[in-house]
Amino acid sequence: MLSRRTKTIVVCTLVCMARLNVYVPDELAERARARGLNVSALTQAAISAELENSATDAWLEGLEPRSTGARHDDVLGAIDAARDEFEA
């Protein structure tokens, strides 16, 4: 939309979001208010992180275990050698 008076463009974006009730202890809510935290953004980030972690866990559980025949100590030694090489 173009404003005739100021000749600037005004953009309006509609975002549909569900409204949820989140219950936290009174003391935690007070501390969040005192710090000026955006509880909505923090809640969104926490839910997103949990969903991503759950998806990763589900993917890992779906993998078939395969033995490479490599011993754990040999793998750790190879990783240490690679780190040393890249740090040099």
Swiss-Prot record:
Q: Which gene encodes it?
A: vapB3
Source organism per entry reads Mycobacterium tuberculosis (strain ATCC 25618 / H37Rv)
- Induction context: Induced during infection of mouse macrophages. Induced in persister cells in response to D-cycloserine.
InterPro entries named in the record? Post-segregation_anti-tox_CcdA
Keywords (alphabetical) are:
Toxin-antitoxin system
What's a GO biological-process term for it?
Answer: negative regulation of growth
Output the superkingdom of the source species. Answer: Bacteria
Q: Name one Pfam family in it.
A: CcdA
Q: What does this protein do?
A: Antitoxin component of a type II toxin-antitoxin (TA) system. Upon expression in M.smegmatis neutralizes the effect of cognate toxin VapC3.
The identity of this protein, by name, is Antitoxin VapB3
